């Protein structure tokens, strides 16, 4: 029967259920599979049962939390999607004093509950509907990461359903202090190894968490593309100013650690380039210093900053003003915590350890302004450049599975559209832009670049093992051999056990 319940509150949603068309879709509408069922689970015990049934019946399974996987890793045919989005508990264990987050929590769930109940937070992402299940284990970051590091830098333990050598599904809890090397490998693999590799995460554990700011300063300003087209040198000046500021102010302990910015380099059709900045805390000076640095050398007679009117993808801005606003931190977080419409999309990423070289700035200009039959105008395409570094870079590259610990900027290439007929032109634009920036091998680590971000997964990458994980990949392979010997959990770019 449709909606045939397994054990309340979990239920099985099959193709004849009216919920099925919704539950087989995620954020990226390019990926729609046709699984035998979607198992909406309500607790860890149910997950063990579902995983065991899939193993016994030789059915492939995938896991969905918030549904924000950029590629089609979760969508599948003739298998089972384990939907953990109902596991949304967040709290503090009265016996251990540890904080916990269940894997179905969204970013907004964790911000809201941790702040209201305990006055703490996690340096997680700016999209409210992203699920903790995939976000944290991929090394999630956000607007407090320069201040507090990555989500995984606070992780102390993980509860996960694995399948052992005897093909038995079981719930295990491992921590940073687990007694065996194998258990420590499994814990470490969840500090940036990414989702869909080792098991079904049910809960994250944190011995301590950073205190949340009480307030924050926000500013959002824009520059008109019409001015930039007329004065190309000013575009290069803004881009260089941005890179140089963070090249000089991203070391651990920097007085600008509380400052985080998002530069939305939209395509020309969007009308504006938009900059959003947050400074956590009551001190406005770091924000003012940064904004002054951004417009250093900019001839305001030729180009003036204006109030933004453009929102791209899920990224919001503070509208209708060019002035900084002081507000309670949770309110500021909510103001920037957009999600946007579910559309078709494609994404790519790169870490940078230095400001933009001249050749890259030339490529950025070309691919943001190009409009022709092959690359038609799209106001929903952009290169987003996030600030990075500071507390993130205080951690050794092998202390977690995230090896990029010397970067100052994190780039996300994005394009959104609605109709399948538009797939080819959008994929061509983003793919050709990316190759113009880095060549066919992608952003291989060197003195300027440092690979790619596993949570912005990209099926086009050939040497993804090195671009995501660098020298940390062999230890991930070891954890795979130990904890998923039958490769139950796999996808196009999942960790391979190897020899």
How would you name each of these model-derived features?
Residues 124, 129-230:
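FAD-binding subdomain of flavoenzyme oxidoreductases
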Residues 45, 75-105, 143, 147-148, ...:
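Glycine-/small-residue-rich beta-strand-loop submotif within the FAD-binding core of flavoenzymes
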Residues 46, 97, 101, 105-112, ...:
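Short, structural beta-strand-to-alpha-helix junction motif
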Residues 54, 165, 484:
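Conserved, mostly hydrophobic/aromatic
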């Amino acid at each position: 029967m449709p909606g045939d319940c397994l054990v309340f509150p979990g239920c099985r949603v099959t193709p004849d259920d009216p919920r099925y068309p919704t539950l087989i879709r995620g954020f990226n509408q390019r990926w729609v599979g046709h699984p035998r069922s979607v198992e909406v689970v309500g607790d860890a015990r149910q997950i063990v049962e579902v995983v065991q049934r899939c193993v016994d019946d030789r059915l492939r399974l995938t896991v969905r939390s918030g549904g924000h996987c950029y590629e089609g890793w979760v969508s599948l045919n003739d298998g089972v999607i384990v939907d953990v989005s109902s596991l949304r508990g967040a709290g503090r264990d009265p016996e251990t004093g540890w904080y916990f987050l269940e894997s179905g929590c969204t970013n907004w769930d964790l911000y809201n509950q941790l702040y209201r109940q305990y006055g703490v937070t996690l340096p997680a992402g700016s999209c409210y509907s992203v699920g903790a299940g995939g976000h944290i284990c991929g090394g999630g970051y956000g607007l407090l990461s320069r201040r507090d590091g990555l989500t995984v830098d606070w992780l102390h333990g993980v509860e996960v359903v694995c399948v052992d050598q005897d093909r038995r599904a079981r719930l295990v809890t491992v921590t940073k202090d687990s007694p065996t090397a194998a258990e420590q490998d499994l814990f470490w693999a969840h500090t940036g190894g990414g989702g869909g590799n080792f098991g079904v995460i049910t809960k994250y554990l944190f011995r301590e968490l950073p205190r949340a700011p009480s307030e924050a300063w926000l500013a959002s300003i824009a520059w008109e593309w019409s001015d930039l087209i007329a004065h190309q040198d000013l575009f290069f000046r803004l881009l260089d100013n941005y890179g140089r500021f963070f090249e000089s102010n991203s070391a651990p302990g920097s007085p600008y650690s509380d400052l985080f910015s998002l530069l939305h380099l939209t395509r020309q059709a969007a009308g504006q380039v938009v900059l959003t900045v947050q400074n956590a805390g009551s001190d406005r000076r770091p924000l003012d210093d940064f904004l002054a640095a951004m417009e250093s050398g900019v001839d305001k007679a030729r180009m003036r900053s204006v109030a933004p009117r453009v929102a791209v993808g899920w990224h919001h801005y503070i509208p209708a003003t060019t002035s900084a606003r002081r507000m309670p931190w949770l309110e500021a977080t909510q103001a920037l915590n957009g999600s946007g419409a579910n559309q078709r999309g494609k994404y790519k990423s790169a870490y940078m350890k230095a400001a933009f070289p001249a050749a890259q700035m030339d490529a950025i200009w070309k691919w943001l302004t190009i409009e022709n039959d092959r690359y038609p105008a799209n106001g929903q395409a952009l290169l987003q450049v996030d600030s990075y570094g500071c507390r993130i870079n205080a951690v050794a590259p092998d202390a977690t599975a995230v090896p990029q610990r010397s970067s100052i900027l994190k780039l996300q290439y994005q394009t959104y559209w609605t109709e399948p007929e538009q797939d080819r032109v959008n994929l061509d634009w983003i793919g050709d832009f990316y190759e113009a920036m880095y060549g066919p091998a992608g952003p291989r680590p060197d003195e300027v670049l440092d690979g790619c971000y596993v949570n912005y997964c990209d099926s086009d990458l050939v040497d993804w093992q090195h671009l995501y994980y660098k020298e940390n990949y062999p230890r991930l392979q070891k954890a795979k051999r130990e904890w998923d010997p039958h490769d139950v959990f796999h996808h196009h770019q999942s960790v391979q056990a190897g020899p």
